[in-house]
Amino acid sequence: IRLARALEPYNIWWFEEPVPVESTHALRQVRENVGVPICVGERLHTRWEFVPILENELADFIMPDVTWTGGISELKKIATMAEAYYVPISPHDASGPINVLAGAHAMASVPNHYRVETHSAKLNAYDVFIDHPLDIRGDKIYLSDRPGLGIELDKDYMRAHVVAGYGG
């Protein structure tokens, strides 16, 4: 709570995962005592885990991870639930180009989409893993008209960079 209050003058986008998200009691304490927006959800895995967050108005934004929630279909269900509570969604990214593009594709048809949470300064680092570079212009990602997510993993690159003991 002290940290969130100290950040209030800086108009941050959100205070991410301020407490373990399964502790709705602690999250409520933070929510009631700070003025910064709160974002939670990267560690929740199903739409049912988002219910208490949404019903109790414990977050200004939610950030489900498309990989950890089970894919695009579950992510879209979570987004629809959040829309009913007027809560914007910002898919979490910590897994690479497939995760970024899956989240971006899902959000292309979600009215309460805020942004795809990622480390935009490092997105081009993903290009070595894939057959087509991510189309990043400014602060936006543009989706391909190629089938699926619009990319394929560069299997030759992946094979050449296998870490001993981890497959290959």
Give the ranges of each region predicted by the language model.
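Adenosine-nucleotide cofactor-binding segment
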Residues: I1
